[in-house]
Amino acid sequence: MSKFNRREPTYSDLVDGLLAAITDSMSYALSIGEALLKTNTRPALKPVCIHLLHPPKDILSVELGHLEESLKAKFYELTNMFPFNKGFEIVLISSDTSVDWSKALPAPFMKTQLNNSLPLGQKSLYVSAWQGTYAHYIKYVCQIEGYAQPDLVVAFQPNFAKSPHKLMMDWTDDLKIILTNSFACLFTFSDKDEKQKAFNVLDAFQTHFVSVQSNQFSSLMLKQLPQKPNCVYAKSSFCIVIRGFKRDSESSANKYLNSELTLGRTSFYKMKNICVLF
Protein backbone atom coordinates (compact mmCIF):
# COMPACT_ATOMS: atom_id res chain seq x y z
CA MET A 1 0.00 0.00 0.00
CA SER A 2 1.23 3.50 -0.74
CA LYS A 3 1.70 6.17 1.88
CA PHE A 4 -1.58 7.69 0.69
CA ASN A 5 -3.38 4.44 1.57
CA ARG A 6 -4.32 3.72 -2.03
CA ARG A 7 -4.67 0.22 -3.36
CA GLU A 8 -1.87 -0.77 -5.67
CA PRO A 9 -3.10 -1.61 -9.18
CA THR A 10 -3.45 -5.27 -10.02
CA TYR A 11 -2.69 -6.92 -13.35
CA SER A 12 -6.40 -6.77 -14.17
CA ASP A 13 -6.41 -3.04 -13.46
CA LEU A 14 -3.50 -2.54 -15.85
CA VAL A 15 -5.25 -4.53 -18.59
CA ASP A 16 -8.46 -2.56 -18.12
CA GLY A 17 -6.54 0.71 -18.27
CA LEU A 18 -4.75 -0.36 -21.45
CA LEU A 19 -8.02 -1.41 -23.10
CA ALA A 20 -9.62 1.89 -22.10
CA ALA A 21 -6.78 3.87 -23.68
CA ILE A 22 -6.76 1.79 -26.88
CA THR A 23 -10.52 1.87 -27.39
CA ASP A 24 -10.61 5.60 -26.68
CA SER A 25 -8.05 6.12 -29.44
CA MET A 26 -9.67 3.78 -31.98
CA SER A 27 -13.35 4.45 -31.32
CA TYR A 28 -13.77 7.18 -33.94
CA ALA A 29 -12.21 5.20 -36.79
CA LEU A 30 -14.07 1.97 -35.99
CA SER A 31 -17.39 3.81 -35.66
CA ILE A 32 -16.88 5.32 -39.12
CA GLY A 33 -16.02 1.91 -40.55
CA GLU A 34 -19.19 0.36 -39.17
CA ALA A 35 -21.27 3.23 -40.59
CA LEU A 36 -19.73 2.66 -44.03
CA LEU A 37 -20.85 -0.96 -43.86
CA LYS A 38 -24.38 -0.03 -42.77
CA THR A 39 -24.74 2.42 -45.66
CA ASN A 40 -23.37 -0.10 -48.21
CA THR A 41 -20.36 2.06 -49.02
CA ARG A 42 -17.64 -0.04 -50.66
CA PRO A 43 -14.12 1.37 -50.27
CA ALA A 44 -12.80 -1.46 -52.45
CA LEU A 45 -14.59 -0.03 -55.50
CA LYS A 46 -13.62 3.65 -55.30
CA PRO A 47 -11.90 6.22 -53.05
CA VAL A 48 -14.09 7.25 -50.13
CA CYS A 49 -14.65 10.87 -49.11
CA ILE A 50 -15.72 11.54 -45.50
CA HIS A 51 -16.82 14.95 -44.22
CA LEU A 52 -16.21 15.49 -40.50
CA LEU A 53 -18.35 18.38 -39.24
CA HIS A 54 -17.57 20.45 -36.15
CA PRO A 55 -14.53 18.35 -35.08
CA PRO A 56 -14.56 17.61 -31.32
CA LYS A 57 -11.91 19.17 -29.12
CA ASP A 58 -10.17 15.89 -28.26
CA ILE A 59 -9.34 15.41 -31.96
CA LEU A 60 -7.64 18.80 -32.05
CA SER A 61 -5.77 18.46 -28.74
CA VAL A 62 -2.30 18.72 -30.28
CA GLU A 63 -0.15 21.51 -31.66
CA LEU A 64 -1.12 22.64 -35.14
CA GLY A 65 2.21 21.53 -36.55
CA HIS A 66 1.51 17.93 -35.54
CA LEU A 67 -2.22 17.89 -36.26
CA GLU A 68 -2.07 16.13 -39.62
CA GLU A 69 0.16 13.37 -38.26
CA SER A 70 -2.07 12.96 -35.19
CA LEU A 71 -5.28 12.73 -37.24
CA LYS A 72 -3.81 10.15 -39.60
CA ALA A 73 -2.87 8.03 -36.59
CA LYS A 74 -6.40 8.33 -35.15
CA PHE A 75 -8.12 7.26 -38.36
CA TYR A 76 -5.58 4.88 -39.92
CA GLU A 77 -7.46 1.84 -38.63
CA LEU A 78 -9.97 2.52 -41.43
CA THR A 79 -7.43 1.23 -43.93
CA ASN A 80 -7.12 -2.02 -41.96
CA MET A 81 -10.90 -2.49 -41.72
CA PHE A 82 -11.07 -2.33 -45.52
CA PRO A 83 -7.77 -3.89 -46.66
CA PHE A 84 -8.59 -3.59 -50.38
CA ASN A 85 -9.64 0.05 -50.20
CA LYS A 86 -8.90 2.57 -52.94
CA GLY A 87 -8.01 5.29 -50.43
CA PHE A 88 -9.75 7.60 -47.98
CA GLU A 89 -9.93 11.36 -47.63
CA ILE A 90 -11.28 12.86 -44.40
CA VAL A 91 -12.22 16.53 -44.76
CA LEU A 92 -12.58 18.47 -41.52
CA ILE A 93 -15.14 21.25 -42.03
CA SER A 94 -15.55 23.91 -39.38
CA SER A 95 -16.57 27.54 -39.10
CA ASP A 96 -14.46 27.93 -35.95
CA THR A 97 -12.23 30.96 -36.52
CA SER A 98 -9.99 30.21 -33.53
CA VAL A 99 -8.07 27.70 -35.66
CA ASP A 100 -6.24 28.68 -38.85
CA TRP A 101 -6.96 25.56 -40.85
CA SER A 102 -4.82 26.71 -43.79
CA LYS A 103 -1.74 26.38 -41.57
CA ALA A 104 -2.83 23.20 -39.81
CA LEU A 105 -3.94 20.98 -42.70
CA PRO A 106 -3.85 20.95 -46.52
CA ALA A 107 -6.87 21.94 -48.58
CA PRO A 108 -9.25 19.25 -49.94
CA PHE A 109 -8.06 17.63 -53.16
CA MET A 110 -10.38 14.72 -54.06
CA LYS A 111 -12.56 15.73 -57.01
CA THR A 112 -15.54 14.04 -58.59
CA GLN A 113 -13.54 13.26 -61.71
CA LEU A 114 -10.40 11.69 -60.28
CA ASN A 115 -7.26 11.88 -62.36
CA ASN A 116 -3.98 10.01 -62.24
CA SER A 117 -2.14 12.91 -60.63
CA LEU A 118 -3.95 12.43 -57.32
CA PRO A 119 -1.88 10.39 -54.86
CA LEU A 120 -4.74 8.08 -53.91
CA GLY A 121 -4.05 4.41 -53.70
CA GLN A 122 -4.63 1.24 -51.72
CA LYS A 123 -4.42 1.73 -47.92
CA SER A 124 -3.84 5.47 -48.31
CA LEU A 125 -5.37 7.97 -45.91
CA TYR A 126 -5.41 11.74 -46.44
CA VAL A 127 -6.64 14.39 -44.05
CA SER A 128 -7.59 17.89 -45.19
CA ALA A 129 -9.59 20.82 -43.87
CA TRP A 130 -11.83 23.65 -45.01
CA GLN A 131 -12.92 26.66 -42.99
CA GLY A 132 -16.48 27.92 -43.40
CA THR A 133 -20.06 26.72 -43.31
CA TYR A 134 -21.04 23.31 -44.62
CA ALA A 135 -23.75 24.80 -46.82
CA HIS A 136 -21.14 26.98 -48.56
CA TYR A 137 -18.78 24.02 -48.96
CA ILE A 138 -21.39 21.83 -50.65
CA LYS A 139 -22.81 24.59 -52.86
CA TYR A 140 -19.59 26.19 -54.08
CA VAL A 141 -16.68 23.83 -53.41
CA CYS A 142 -18.45 20.59 -54.34
CA GLN A 143 -21.17 21.54 -56.83
CA ILE A 144 -19.36 24.38 -58.63
CA GLU A 145 -15.65 23.61 -58.26
CA GLY A 146 -16.16 19.87 -58.65
CA TYR A 147 -14.76 18.53 -55.39
CA ALA A 148 -16.09 15.19 -54.20
CA GLN A 149 -19.37 15.05 -52.34
CA PRO A 150 -19.30 12.89 -49.21
CA ASP A 151 -19.84 9.17 -49.10
CA LEU A 152 -20.41 9.72 -45.38
CA VAL A 153 -20.93 12.79 -43.18
CA VAL A 154 -19.79 12.39 -39.57
CA ALA A 155 -20.48 14.36 -36.41
CA PHE A 156 -18.97 13.07 -33.17
CA GLN A 157 -20.80 14.12 -30.01
CA PRO A 158 -22.90 16.81 -31.75
CA ASN A 159 -24.56 19.20 -29.33
CA PHE A 160 -27.51 20.16 -31.52
CA ALA A 161 -29.92 18.43 -29.11
CA LYS A 162 -28.77 20.27 -25.99
CA SER A 163 -30.39 23.66 -26.52
CA PRO A 164 -32.64 25.31 -29.13
CA HIS A 165 -30.16 28.16 -29.54
CA LYS A 166 -27.27 25.79 -30.30
CA LEU A 167 -29.42 23.85 -32.73
CA MET A 168 -30.40 26.99 -34.62
CA MET A 169 -26.87 28.39 -34.70
CA ASP A 170 -24.92 25.30 -35.70
CA TRP A 171 -27.14 22.62 -37.16
CA THR A 172 -30.25 23.88 -38.96
CA ASP A 173 -28.49 24.59 -42.26
CA ASP A 174 -26.27 21.52 -41.92
CA LEU A 175 -29.24 19.21 -41.42
CA LYS A 176 -30.99 20.76 -44.41
CA ILE A 177 -27.97 20.06 -46.64
CA ILE A 178 -27.53 16.52 -45.32
CA LEU A 179 -31.19 15.55 -45.68
CA THR A 180 -32.03 17.21 -49.00
CA ASN A 181 -28.94 15.68 -50.65
CA SER A 182 -29.57 12.26 -49.05
CA PHE A 183 -26.04 12.10 -47.67
CA ALA A 184 -25.38 9.15 -45.39
CA CYS A 185 -24.62 10.58 -41.96
CA LEU A 186 -23.27 9.21 -38.67
CA PHE A 187 -23.92 10.86 -35.30
CA THR A 188 -22.35 9.50 -32.11
CA PHE A 189 -23.38 10.31 -28.55
CA SER A 190 -21.91 9.75 -25.11
CA ASP A 191 -25.19 9.96 -23.22
CA LYS A 192 -28.41 7.98 -23.75
CA ASP A 193 -30.63 10.98 -23.04
CA GLU A 194 -28.74 13.06 -25.61
CA LYS A 195 -29.17 10.28 -28.16
CA GLN A 196 -32.90 10.13 -27.51
CA LYS A 197 -33.29 13.91 -27.86
CA ALA A 198 -31.37 13.82 -31.12
CA PHE A 199 -33.55 10.98 -32.38
CA ASN A 200 -36.70 12.99 -31.64
CA VAL A 201 -35.31 16.06 -33.39
CA LEU A 202 -34.33 14.06 -36.49
CA ASP A 203 -37.63 12.17 -36.49
CA ALA A 204 -39.49 15.49 -36.57
CA PHE A 205 -37.73 16.16 -39.89
CA GLN A 206 -39.16 12.87 -41.27
CA THR A 207 -35.65 11.44 -41.40
CA HIS A 208 -34.96 7.94 -42.70
CA PHE A 209 -33.04 6.06 -39.97
CA VAL A 210 -30.60 3.41 -41.11
CA SER A 211 -29.58 2.50 -37.56
CA VAL A 212 -30.23 3.69 -33.99
CA GLN A 213 -28.37 1.63 -31.40
CA SER A 214 -25.63 1.26 -28.83
CA ASN A 215 -22.20 1.52 -30.41
CA GLN A 216 -20.19 -1.69 -30.16
CA PHE A 217 -17.03 0.35 -30.82
CA SER A 218 -17.51 2.88 -28.03
CA SER A 219 -14.63 3.96 -25.84
CA LEU A 220 -14.13 2.03 -22.59
CA MET A 221 -12.65 5.07 -20.87
CA LEU A 222 -15.27 6.26 -18.39
CA LYS A 223 -15.67 9.96 -17.64
CA GLN A 224 -18.03 12.26 -15.76
CA LEU A 225 -20.11 15.19 -16.92
CA PRO A 226 -20.03 18.34 -14.76
CA GLN A 227 -23.82 18.65 -14.98
CA LYS A 228 -24.26 14.96 -14.01
CA PRO A 229 -21.62 14.25 -11.33
CA ASN A 230 -23.27 10.99 -10.25
CA CYS A 231 -23.21 9.49 -13.74
CA VAL A 232 -20.42 8.19 -15.92
CA TYR A 233 -20.27 8.09 -19.70
CA ALA A 234 -18.01 6.81 -22.45
CA LYS A 235 -17.23 8.47 -25.76
CA SER A 236 -19.41 7.37 -28.69
CA SER A 237 -21.53 4.99 -26.59
CA PHE A 238 -24.52 5.42 -28.93
CA CYS A 239 -24.83 6.05 -32.65
CA ILE A 240 -27.45 7.11 -35.16
CA VAL A 241 -27.02 6.57 -38.90
CA ILE A 242 -29.38 8.38 -41.27
CA ARG A 243 -29.83 8.86 -45.01
CA GLY A 244 -32.28 11.37 -46.45
CA PHE A 245 -36.00 11.46 -45.76
CA LYS A 246 -38.50 8.69 -45.21
CA ARG A 247 -39.64 7.47 -48.61
CA ASP A 248 -43.34 8.04 -47.97
CA SER A 249 -42.86 11.64 -46.84
CA GLU A 250 -39.98 12.92 -48.94
CA SER A 251 -41.99 15.53 -50.81
CA SER A 252 -43.65 16.98 -47.70
CA ALA A 253 -40.35 17.05 -45.82
CA ASN A 254 -38.62 18.87 -48.65
CA LYS A 255 -41.47 21.37 -48.76
CA TYR A 256 -41.17 21.95 -45.05
CA LEU A 257 -37.40 22.45 -45.18
CA ASN A 258 -37.58 24.90 -48.03
CA SER A 259 -40.21 27.04 -46.32
CA GLU A 260 -39.60 26.76 -42.59
CA LEU A 261 -35.83 26.48 -42.40
CA THR A 262 -34.82 28.81 -45.18
CA LEU A 263 -37.38 31.59 -44.90
CA GLY A 264 -38.33 31.55 -41.25
CA ARG A 265 -36.02 29.86 -38.82
CA THR A 266 -37.93 31.12 -35.82
CA SER A 267 -40.90 29.02 -36.85
CA PHE A 268 -38.75 26.01 -36.01
CA TYR A 269 -39.90 26.32 -32.41
CA LYS A 270 -43.51 25.84 -33.47
CA MET A 271 -42.89 22.20 -34.16
CA LYS A 272 -44.59 20.41 -31.28
CA ASN A 273 -42.40 17.33 -31.43
CA ILE A 274 -39.28 19.40 -30.91
CA CYS A 275 -40.53 21.99 -28.47
CA VAL A 276 -41.44 19.37 -25.88
CA LEU A 277 -37.81 18.28 -25.68
CA PHE A 278 -36.41 21.43 -24.14
Predicted regions mapped to residue ranges:
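Alpha-helical interaction elements in eukaryotic regulators
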Residues: 167-171
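Positively charged, amphipathic N-terminal segments that serve as targeting/anchoring signals
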Residues: 1-152, 156-166, 179-184, 188, ...
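C-terminal functional extensions of proteins
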Residues: 172, 176, 180-278
